[in-house]
Each structure stands twice: as C-alpha cells, then as structure tokens.
Amino acid sequence: WMIVASWLCTAVFALSAIPALVDPVDAVAVYFAVSVALFLAGCALFMVDLVLAAARSRDAAMGIGGIFFLAGSAPRPVQLHLLGSLVVQIVVAVLAAALDPFTPLAFGTLVPIIGLAFCGLWSVRHGLFPERAQ
C-alpha cells in the first residue's frame, strides 16, 4: 500500500501543478493547498518513521541510506517505485518553481518530503537490515 500511496501523492501533486502553471492566478491556491498538505502529511509520516526506526534499530544495524534511500534494504522493484515516485516529485517541484519563480509555486519544493517518508516507512516496516552486533 505504501508504493500505491506514494504514487497517488505524486499524481495529485503533478496534476495540481499543471493548472497552476497554465493559469497561476486562479489555480495557484489549489497547488499551494496540495503542496502544504502533502508536506505536512510527509512531516507526520517522517516522525512515525523515526519512532519505528528507533525501535527497530535496537536489533538491526540501520543506516540513513538504507532507511530513506533504500540502499541495500529493499528489492530492486520496490526501490524503483518508491525512489521513482520521489524523483518525479522533485522534478515537478523544481520545474514548477523554475518556470514561475518568486511565486507560491515555490512551496512545491516541500512536497518531496512525503516521498522520502514513504521510503522510510517501507524500509522500517519491511527493509532487510543486518542484525546488530552485541
């Protein structure tokens, strides 16, 4: 479900960016609301990740790269989906902010925190980490 949710957030964000770029006067409020909502949801999910990672790190040797970038902790298809979703979020955010700088479109750059948070959630729930040496 985490992969589907990550792609769903990416799609909602990208679909809100298109009208905001075409008609910034009327559609920028929706883009702003979507961006802030996804950022806040990402922050909350990130806190859950940190709590779960702290609990799991008692038994497993976990690193930041393995938790949030799935380095060595997730199968290739999972990496491609979750990191792919994160990359699309980054591209949409940077593109929107670059095409109309110094506007509320810059708030889109906060959105990729949710993609990163879904990577973290997947890894702390399902990731493969070596056991911690006692």
Describe these PLM feature segments.
Residues 1-41, 82-85, 90-98:
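Long, highly hydrophobic alpha-helical transmembrane signal-anchor segments
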Residues 17, 46-49, 120:
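Structural signal for membrane-spanning alpha-helices in multi-pass inner-membrane proteins
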Residues 20-24, 53-60, 100, 124-131:
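Perimembrane helix-loop junctions in membrane proteins
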Residues 107-134:
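Alpha-helical transmembrane segments and their immediate juxtamembrane interface regions
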